[in-house]
A protein has these predicted regions:
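Periplasmic/ER-lumenal interhelical loops and adjacent helix-loop junctions
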Residues: 13, 68-89, 94, 98-100, ...
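Membrane-embedded helix bundles of polyisoprenyl
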Residues: 43, 145-151, 160-204, 208-244, ...
Length: 504
């Protein structure tokens, strides 16, 4: 009888502790299976989310930048595999009243900095463009998940804190909107958790060649995924970080320098079209967010994709996908309180995170109005390639979401266990954030976008590979390839010298 009573009591205690498993890492240790199940469930939910967002690859990618820019570019690679040719020159007709996949600047495909050249492009030999897009998003989403798990481990995030972080980072309006309109090259956004993790490692420890190698290869992949913009923002972030980390200056410079050299195979060919870009006005600077108020409105209010001038900039045709950072009202309050107010009020709690404040602030400021024009005065081609400053908010948004979650966990740790109010409030936040992000996805998913904007003209029939003799172009590609290879070998060698695997 006593034994049966004890079993019932133990089960009741188990049920009683269950809510706190999601809020307290110590209690979580008793339920390891639940931790694994929760993390896997979130990942599977993400796979479902992006599949549903893409309408399970059924929606034709023939609208907005999908149809104008990226479907023709991906079809170019598919043609390359069908014909066993190199991806050198693109032969695509100019369609009246429509942008060209290579922006009417050149037929040299690799001279355009924001085209995808990742290893997974090989999948286009077997997959349709729609299926490739889904797989490509899942690959980058998986990389983001690994980065978020690094933060969970380092800052001992509870299951619920990790869940909120997972939702806010992976499914916010910023990344949804860019994929919705056809910016497949926005995969670099998913690399930001690992980038911020490397910045924290720099600030907290003694950097070395292994750290430089990690940064260089991460940013190299960022370039390969077509995220030239994100690469630039990361370099700006490093540049400002150097001002507050003089003792790490040489390592920051080394990371930026070797990132550029490693990416030479993709960063050198655009040199050939710089004069055309300036002559054609292809890099004309557009305005960012008119005011800070517009930033907070874009954070909290769900705007339909076809709605114009919600953010009233100087350019009336700029659509909301250039300003969208939606996380909903609850998500906004979460970010503002824990990611801004708590960060400022309790900065000393996490000394390493203090170093992130100035770079995050500077990149954010550059998204406002015409302030990015200050950097354009230096006439540095890499910086001049940034023409829509509001897009840069992706990096500070990622940083603040990460920091908000860290301070949210600190807040949880200060509360007494089994506090009903804390449990209800925390779970309510998770549910409401999930609901708001799903509502946004329903409004911005590809099928809704195609209905709102309709198809454009595309010329995907026949071959778009039009290779021809072009010695300057070939020379630059060869030089860039050799620089990338030798830089990669050098970095791996220096890393091996620091951490030799043989003889241990």
């Amino acid at each position: 009888m006593n034994s049966a009573f004890q079993n019932i009591r133990m089960r009741m205690d188990w049920v009683k502790e269950l809510p706190d498993v999601f809020l307290d890492r110590q209690i979580e240790q008793k339920f390891r299976w639940l931790s694994i199940l929760w993390i896997m469930a979130l990942y599977v939910a993400g796979v479902f989310f992006w599949g549903n967002f893409l309408n399970w690859t059924r929606t034709p990618l023939d609208f907005e930048d999908w149809g104008i820019i990226n479907s023709p570019r991906l079809d170019f690679f598919a043609d390359m595999f069908r014909e066993d040719k190199l991806p050198l020159h693109m032969d695509y007709p100019k369609i009246e009243g429509q942008e060209h996949p290579l922006h009417r600047l050149t037929d040299r495909y690799l001279a355009i900095p924001d085209v995808i050249t990742t290893p997974q492009i090989l999948l286009l030999k077997f997959l349709s463009i729609n299926k490739f897009v889904y797989i490509d998003i899942l690959i980058n989403f998986t990389i983001a998940t690994l980065g978020l798990l690094w933060f969970r481990k380092k800052y001992e995030l509870s299951l619920l804190a990790y869940g909120i972080l997972f939702l806010l980072f992976n499914f916010n309006g910023y990344i949804q909107a860019h994929y919705a309109v056809g910016h497949i090259t926005w995969g670099g956004y998913f690399l930001f958790p690992l980038f911020v993790a490397l910045v924290i490692q720099l600030v907290e420890g003694q950097p070395n060649w292994m750290w430089v190698t990690k940064v260089a290869f991460l940013l190299y992949y960022m370039v390969l995924v077509g995220s030239q913009h994100h690469f630039i923002w990361a370099l700006i972030f490093f540049g400002v970080l150097a001002l507050t980390s003089w003792d790490k200056l040489k390592w920051i410079i080394a990371a930026g320098f070797f990132s550029g050299l490693l990416g030479a195979v993709r960063l050198l060919p655009p040199i050939l079209i710089i004069s055309h870009v300036y002559d054609e006005g292809g890099n004309r600077l557009l305005p960012g967010y008119p005011t800070i108020v517009d930033v907070f409105r874009s954070l909290a209010i769900l705007v339909q994709p076809s709605e114009q001038n919600f953010v009233r900039s100087d350019v009336s045709w700029l659509m909301h996908w250039e300003f969208n950072i939606y996380v909903g009202l609850v998500g906004s309050l979460f970010i503002i309180y824990f990611g801004m107010i708590s960060w400022f009020r309790n900065a000393r709690r996490y000394p390493a995170l203090q170093k992130l404040f100035l770079p995050t602030l500077v990149v954010f400021i550059l998204t406002i109005g015409h302030l990015y024009g200050f950097l354009r005065k230096f006439h540095i081609p890499l910086l001049d390639g940034e023409r829509v400053p509001s897009r840069m908010i992706g990096l500070p948004l990622a940083v603040i979401i990460l920091i908000a979650t860290i301070y949210f966990q600190a807040w949880l740790d200060e509360k007494p266990k089994m506090n009903l109010l804390v449990v209800v409030l925390s779970f309510s936040m998770f549910i409401l954030i999930a609901n708001d992000l799903w509502a946004h996805a329903e409004a911005w998913k590809l099928s809704a976008m195609r209905t709102a904007f309709g198809p454009v003209q595309m010329a995907l029939a026949g071959s778009s590979v039009g290779n021809h003799p072009d010695q300057p172009y070939f020379t630059v590609i060869i030089v860039g390839t050799l620089l990338s290879i030798f830089t990669g070998m050098f970095l791996l060698f220096r890393s091996w010298r620091e951490h030799p695997l043989i003889g241990k």
